[in-house]
C-alpha cells in the first residue's frame, strides 16, 4: 500500500517559513502586493481566487482581486494589465483562467511584465524555464518537484510519464523534470496505447481533468503517482486517479484533495515574495 504524499502539511510548513520572510520585509517597510484579474462568472475560478486571497492574508501578503464582467472586452483587460504593470506598488500579477471566449488569454499573459509574472507563464519566463535559467516557475509544476524532494523521492535517471500537455502544468513540469535528470515522456489526448506507456513510469503524473482516468492496471508496482486533477463527481472532489485501487500498487501517491492543490497556492505566494524581494534588491 502506497504512502500518501501529504501536500497540505508540507504547504503549511512552507507557509511558516514564508510568513517569516514576509515579516522581515514588512520590518523594512516592504509589503508584498499581489493582484489577480478574474474575468467572467466561472464558479470554480471564483473559488480559486478566494482560496488564493485567504492564503495571501495568512502569509501577510496584500492581494487585490479585480473582478471583470463576462462581457469584458479584450482592450479593457489589456488596459488593466498595463495599469498594474506601471504601478510600482504592485509586485505580482496573474490572470485567472479560464476566461470568456472573446478574451485572448495568451495575449493577456504576454502583456504581463515578466518581472511581475507570479504565474511564471509569460513567454520570457517560460523561455527561461526551458533554458534552466528560471526565477519563477508555474506554481503547480514547482510544487510537485518540491513535494517529491521533501519526501526524498529520487528523480535522476527515472522514467517520468506526464499525462497532459498544458502550458500551466504538463509542459513546465516536463522542463523541471528534465532539470532533475529524469527521462520524460508526455502523453496527451491523442496518445495511443496510454496504459502501455504509463506502466513504464517510475513516476506517473496525471493532469488531465478526467476523473478516474488512471486505473490500477495502468500503473506498475512501486510507482510514484502524482494526481493533479480536480474533478467534481456526485458532489465530491476527486482526482484523475482511481485512488483507492491505485494506492494498493503505488509506493507513494498524492490524494485529492490535500495533495498538489495546497502546494499550487503556496508556491504562487512564494513567487510573489520572490518577485517582491528582487524588485526591492533584497
UniProtKB/Swiss-Prot annotation:
The gene is folD1. Disulfide bonds: none annotated. InterPro entries: Aminoacid_DH-like_N_sf (IPR046346), NAD(P)-bd_dom_sf (IPR036291), THF_DH/CycHdrlase (IPR000672), THF_DH/CycHdrlase_cat_dom (IPR020630), THF_DH/CycHdrlase_NAD-bd_dom (IPR020631). Belongs to the tetrahydrofolate dehydrogenase/cyclohydrolase family. Coiled coil: none annotated. GO terms for biological process: L-histidine biosynthetic process; methionine biosynthetic process; purine nucleotide biosynthetic process; tetrahydrofolate interconversion. This is Bifunctional protein FolD. It catalyses: (6R)-5,10-methylene-5,6,7,8-tetrahydrofolate + NADP(+) = (6R)-5,10-methenyltetrahydrofolate + NADPH; (6R)-5,10-methenyltetrahydrofolate + H2O = (6R)-10-formyltetrahydrofolate + H(+). Catalyzes the oxidation of 5,10-methylenetetrahydrofolate to 5,10-methenyltetrahydrofolate and then the hydrolysis of 5,10-methenyltetrahydrofolate to 10-formyltetrahydrofolate.
Amino acid at each position: 500500500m502506497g504512502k500518501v504524499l501529504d501536500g497540505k502539511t508540507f504547504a503549511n510548513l512552507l507557509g511558516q517559513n514564508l510568513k517569516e520572510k514576509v515579516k522581515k520585509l514588512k520590518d523594512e517597510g516592504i509589503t508584498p502586493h499581489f493582484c489577480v484579474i478574474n474575468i467572467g462568472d466561472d464558479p470554480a475560478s471564483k473559488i480559486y481566487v478566494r482560496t488564493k486571497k485567504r492564503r495571501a492574508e495568512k502569509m501577510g501578503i496584500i492581494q487585490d482581486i479585480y473582478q471583470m464582467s463576462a462581457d469584458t472586452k479584450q482592450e479593457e483587460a489589456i488596459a488593466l494589465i498595463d495599469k498594474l504593470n506601471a504601478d510600482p506598488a504592485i509586485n505580482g500579477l496573474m490572470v485567472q483562467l479560464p476566461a470568456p471566449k472573446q478574451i485572448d488569454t495568451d495575449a493577456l499573459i504576454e502583456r504581463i511584465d515578466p518581472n511581475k509574472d507570479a504565474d511564471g507563464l509569460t513567454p520570457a519566463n517560460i523561455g527561461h524555464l526551458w533554458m534552466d535559467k528560471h526565477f519563477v516557475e508555474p506554481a503547480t509544476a514547482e510544487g510537485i518537484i518540491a513535494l517529491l524532494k521533501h519526501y526524498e523521492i529520487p528523480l535522476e535517471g527515472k522514467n517520468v510519464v506526464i499525462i497532459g500537455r498544458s502550458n500551466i502544468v504538463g509542459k513546465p513540469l516536463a522542463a523541471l523534470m528534465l532539470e532533475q535528470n529524469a527521462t520524460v515522456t508526455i502523453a496527451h489526448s491523442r496518445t495511443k496505447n496510454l496504459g502501455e506507456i504509463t506502466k513504464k513510469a517510475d513516476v506517473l503524473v496525471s493532469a488531465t481533468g478526467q476523473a478516474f482516468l488512471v486505473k490500477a492496471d495502468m500503473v506498475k508496482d512501486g510507482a510514484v503517482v502524482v494526481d493533479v486533477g480536480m474533478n467534481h463527481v456526485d458532489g465530491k472532489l476527486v482526482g484523475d486517479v482511481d485512488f483507492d485501487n491505485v494506492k494498493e500498487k503505488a509506493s507513494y501517491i498524492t490524494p485529492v484533495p490535500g495533495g498538489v492543490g495546497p502546494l499550487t497556492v503556496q508556491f504562487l505566494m512564494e513567487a510573489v515574495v520572490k518577485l517582491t524581494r528582487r524588485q526591492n534588491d533584497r
